[in-house]
């Protein structure tokens, strides 16, 4: 559930932000978001988690800083405790996807087919959504696939900071106890997740990339 919430928070907003920043790089909002993205990429995960914990649990006590619900808690009981770790993970993957999208838009918008659409009098919004966005998406899809796999398998630092009982904490406890009956399935699950995400990304890229569409036709 933590990975799903973080993905829903990060990926749609990263695509929109990267699209707008790439198209309007000199706007104040664009510069501010881009700066935040750079900071999020350079800071270690535990530092982001600590900053969010200080801000939203100590200075502005909106969310609980530590997960203290039982293992059989319902979704409604877990929701107040999931926002902080989800926001931490979302900040990390948002930065990756946003900057990949920005780089793609910056490159694509100067290409001849985009200039041709503008010369035909196509509205800028239509050009952005119909021509620039699909062409800029393939690298973003690959980035999202890697980040989504990481969200499912590599969140033990955030889970440790917020005492969230997830797959990462389970793996750490199993390694500490040398419990191979748990370690091996977790390793196989991680490998399966990365392979599955890679295959899904490859299929989505083939559907989105205009050059591959032309080759198939």
Task: Enumerate the language-model features and the residues they cover.
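Alpha-helical transmembrane segments of integral membrane proteins
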Residues: 1-29, 45, 73-217
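Membrane-water interface segments at the C-terminal ends of transmembrane alpha-helices
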Residues: 35-66, 88-95, 99
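Peri-membrane helix termini and adjoining interfacial loops of integral membrane proteins
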Residues: 12, 55-68, 159-165
């Amino acid at each position: 559930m933590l990975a799903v919430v973080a993905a829903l928070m990060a990926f749609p907003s990263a695509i929109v932000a990267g699209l707008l920043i790439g198209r309007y790089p000199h706007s104040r909002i664009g510069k501010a978001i881009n700066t935040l993205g750079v900071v999020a990429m350079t800071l270690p995960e535990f530092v982001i988690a600590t900053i969010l914990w200080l801000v939203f649990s100590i200075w502005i006590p909106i969310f609980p800083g530590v997960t203290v619900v039982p293992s059989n808690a319902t979704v409604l009981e877990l929701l107040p405790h999931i926002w902080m770790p989800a926001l931490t993970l979302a900040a990390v993957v948002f930065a990756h996807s946003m900057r990949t999208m920005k780089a793609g838009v910056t490159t694509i918008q100067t290409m001849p087919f985009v200039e041709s659409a503008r010369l035909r009098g196509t509205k800028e919004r239509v050009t952005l959504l119909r021509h620039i966005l699909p062409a800029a998406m393939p690298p973003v899809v690959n980035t999202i696939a890697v980040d989504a796999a990481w969200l499912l398998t590599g969140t033990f630092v955030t889970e440790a900071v917020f005492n969230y009982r997830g797959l990462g904490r389970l793996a750490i406890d199993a390694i500490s106890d040398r419990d191979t009956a748990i370690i091996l399935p977790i390793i196989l699950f991680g490998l399966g997740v990365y392979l599955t995400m890679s295959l899904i990304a490859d299929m989505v890229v083939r559907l989105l990339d205009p050059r591959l569409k032309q080759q198939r036709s």
